[in-house]
């Protein structure tokens, strides 16, 4: 999965997919009542990027729905996965459940079109704080209450705080999560970070009793770091330059081992060669 980083304006969906992304990451900020409010990152952000592009969250979902609904004039067949980077740092811990509830209602209405031919992309809820695991509970219980529990088949999870892998496993246990887990690791492109924790995550993914289904690394903009991440065995790379990742994937060293994921590749299943 080539994951376009910080896609917060509707116009950027086309831009990143046209550069080669089959997945995008979108920032979601919340108001003080835990309503998802804007797709917005703010300053500071990655080096070389404009930090302040934004839409209202529900407006963005409408654009995203069009981009992922077959038959729509804006449809991109290859856009198959969306990571919502949930900026829950502005919330109190006890608001996490409410944030999950409100997020589910927004997606149900504006993205899934109440289950009636809505957008088809797989969704990853990426949460920065392990203490906010109840966001997952709130999300799940709301879809059940709204009589669309089947939509959870399209939803996965990530804790993005680079926490100890054992601690992440405990948070999933509390949230009752037993699958659909993406594990992120990384740092802003302005700084360097080694691959030690990525290797631990990959080892967990590949073990018989691990909790991780997929591993992605962020934010990778250079060919050398792309090769290092691929050599470590990641499933996804988040980038500001999808064309760079696509270029490296077309090198002879990688064409035999990797291919770009399509809609038929289940993002919740471990890839077995």
From Swiss-Prot:
GO terms for cellular component: extracellular region
One GO-annotated biological process of the protein: lipid catabolic process
Main location: secreted
Keyword Iron-sulfur found: no
Gene Ontology MF annotations: lyase activity; metal ion binding; phosphoric diester hydrolase activity; toxin activity
EC number(s) given by UniProt: 4.6.1.-
Tissues of expression: Expressed by the venom gland.
Family to which this protein belongs: Belongs to the arthropod phospholipase D family. Class II subfamily.
Annotated protein name in UniProt: Dermonecrotic toxin LsaSicTox-alphaIB1aiii
Biological classification of the source: Eukaryota, Metazoa, Ecdysozoa, Arthropoda, Chelicerata
């Amino acid at each position: 999965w080539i994951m376009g980083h910080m896609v917060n304006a509707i116009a950027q969906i086309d831009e990143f997919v046209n550069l080669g992304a089959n997945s995008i990451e979108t920032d979601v900020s919340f108001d003080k009542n835990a309503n998802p409010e804007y797709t917005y990152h703010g300053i500071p952000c990655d080096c070389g990027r404009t930090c302040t592009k934004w839409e209202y969250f529900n407006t963005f979902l409408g654009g995203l729905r069009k981009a992922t609904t077959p038959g729509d004039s804006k449809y991109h067949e290859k856009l198959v996965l969306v990571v919502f980077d949930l900026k829950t740092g502005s919330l109190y811990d006890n608001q996490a459940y409410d944030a999950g509830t409100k997020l589910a209602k927004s997606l149900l209405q504006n993205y899934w079109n109440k289950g009636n031919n809505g957008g088809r992309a797989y969704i990853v809820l990426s949460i920065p704080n392990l203490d906010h695991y109840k966001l997952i509970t709130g999300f799940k219980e709301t879809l059940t209450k709204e009589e669309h529990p089947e939509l959870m088949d399209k939803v996965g999870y990530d804790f993005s705080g680079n926490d100890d892998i054992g601690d992440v496993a405990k948070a999933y246990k509390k949230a009752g999560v037993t699958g659909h887990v993406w594990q992120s690791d990384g740092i802003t492109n302005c700084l360097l970070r080694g691959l030690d924790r990525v290797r631990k995550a990959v080892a967990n993914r590949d073990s018989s009793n691990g909790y991780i289904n997929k591993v992605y690394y962020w934010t990778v903009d250079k060919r050398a770091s792309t090769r290092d991440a691929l050599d470590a065995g990641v499933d996804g790379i988040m980038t500001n330059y999808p064309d760079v990742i696509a270029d490296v994937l077309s090198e002879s060293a990688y064409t035999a081992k990797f291919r770009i994921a399509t809609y038929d590749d289940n993002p919740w299943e471990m890839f077995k060669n």
